[in-house]
């Protein structure tokens, strides 16, 4: 069967991604000073305005206004003429402490300790109810679906040629989308490449709109598309459509063009729609929030299963109840590609991975990563995807369980 599948990504200057990065910069700053911080930060941006709200309980001392301005400047919003700039936007802060009704389900006297006993791990519950998914497949070296992998590559390259000055007329806001042709479940071609990028009204001495767009399209093909596909077997061909700014113009962008909000790019953050999503956002949440930590753990498990050769693709669902440590349910699906039965895979998962929230935090070191990485960790995954990142050293991307899973699977298979 032949079909098309599309995934999109956005640049770090997209309004929603500005919010995610500010929220995670706040999280980094708080966890660096106080690894036990409870954080549920939300950010809104609009023309000339940033609102930081949510619930935070911490011993850390952080200047939230300066932190937001620094991140906005780093992203590239430095010119007030564009309707949004780091040094001129208003930054409002409206933060409360975490609700004691929520905290009581997670708090224990032992939580602040580094190594907890099995009984202590059982006493630290999930910070909320919910369902989380993790996914991996062998379509790419990073065990991600090809469409989202390509979309992220292009979004990162689009930002890079702006930041280095290679294409100085580009502005921070941008989106990419790639449509891949599949045949019998395997990617066989590139149907469409779409890039929408904010730009100046004139380029050099070119001011006529169609001429401006023609130059942008030609430049993006050479500076973005070609480098992205340079090391890949699958290439665009004469039948591939290449669309750039299909409306014909993208001068007004960023928060001046659209308001932004944390948690509105969930599919971009994960698997590009190729796998299911539980609905919970990541950015601005400390590791006690299973929306984030359990989704990372589910990816870690799925990736190790696929890398171990136990399936070509694997999706894992985990569910939790607030205040309860052990998952309510665990479901695994290999879409007919598994070397073991679902029951055997579930047994392997339960044997080799501890899915209690406090154990996940310990296994992936989620509280101390900002401190250990010089004050920034979560803000770096807040743009260009939380998974399949070769440019970052992420604990949930490690393949350190492959040998254990292979050995355990061999015992199952030898018993048949």
UniProtKB/Swiss-Prot annotation:
Q: In which pathway does it act?
A: Amino-acid biosynthesis; S-adenosyl-L-methionine biosynthesis; S-adenosyl-L-methionine from L-methionine: step 1/1
Q: Which CDD domains match?
A: S-AdoMet_synt (cd18079)
Q: What EC number(s) would the UniProt record show?
A: 2.5.1.6
Q: Where does K(+) bind?
A: 42
Origin: domain of life: Bacteria
Query: Which UniProt keywords are present, listed alphabetically?
Result: ATP-binding, Cytoplasm, Magnesium, Metal-binding, Nucleotide-binding, One-carbon metabolism, Potassium, Transferase
Compartments annotated for it: namely: Cytoplasm
**Residues that coordinate or bind Mg(2+):** 16
Query: Per UniProt, where does ATP bind?
Result: 14, 173-175, 249-250, 258, 264-265, 281, 285
According to the UniProt record, where is the region Flexible loop?
Answer: 98-108
Q: Which family does it belong to?
A: Belongs to the AdoMet synthase family.
What functional role does this protein have? Catalyzes the formation of S-adenosylmethionine (AdoMet) from methionine and ATP. The overall synthetic reaction is composed of two sequential steps, AdoMet formation and the subsequent tripolyphosphate hydrolysis which occurs prior to release of AdoMet from the enzyme.
Q: Could you tell me what this protein is called?
A: S-adenosylmethionine synthase
